[in-house]
Amino acid sequence: MIKSELVQRIAEHNPHLYQRDVENIVNAILDEIVAALARGDRVELRGFGAFSVKHRPARAGRNPRTGEHVPVDQKSVPFFKTGKEMRERLNRDNATSEANA
């Protein structure tokens, strides 16, 4: 699912909201998550999961084409850990679909 599909589904389930308003809300939520991560904060959505930033140290890498050793700078990468309720639902839904197969 892409963002536009998410917006469309939310708008369908909430006919009192205009689709452009739903899009603005979704964008605002995502912008706030990114801003919090940029500040170094952890974003926890209970039952869904938690977003955080992991810091990868600088290391020696290798160019796969030439085999040359190259330095790789340190970097920060986003990390998402699923919440307990999401894991349980995914496992329950997966078990149900496998039983029906």
From Swiss-Prot:
Which SUPFAM superfamilies does the UniProt entry name for this protein?
IHF-like DNA-binding proteins
Ranges where the record places region Disordered: 57-76
Which PROSITE patterns does this one have?
HISTONE_LIKE
Q: Which of UniProt's keywords are assigned here?
A: DNA recombination, DNA-binding, Transcription, Transcription regulation, Translation regulation
Matching entries from InterPro entries are given as: Hist_DNA-bd (IPR000119), Histone-like_DNA-bd_CS (IPR020816), IHF-like_DNA-bd_dom_sf (IPR010992), IHF_beta (IPR005685)
Q: Its Gene Ontology biological processes?
A: DNA recombination; regulation of DNA-templated transcription; regulation of translation
Q: Which CDD domains match?
A: IHF_B
Please provide an example of a Pfam family that matches this protein in its UniProt record.
Answer: Bac_DNA_binding
- Membrane spanning segments where? none
Q: What does this protein do?
A: This protein is one of the two subunits of integration host factor, a specific DNA-binding protein that functions in genetic recombination as well as in transcriptional and translational control.
Family, similarity comment = Belongs to the bacterial histone-like protein family.
Describe the protein's quaternary organization and the partners it interacts with: Heterodimer of an alpha and a beta chain.
Name-wise, this protein is Integration host factor subunit beta
* Record gene name: ihfB
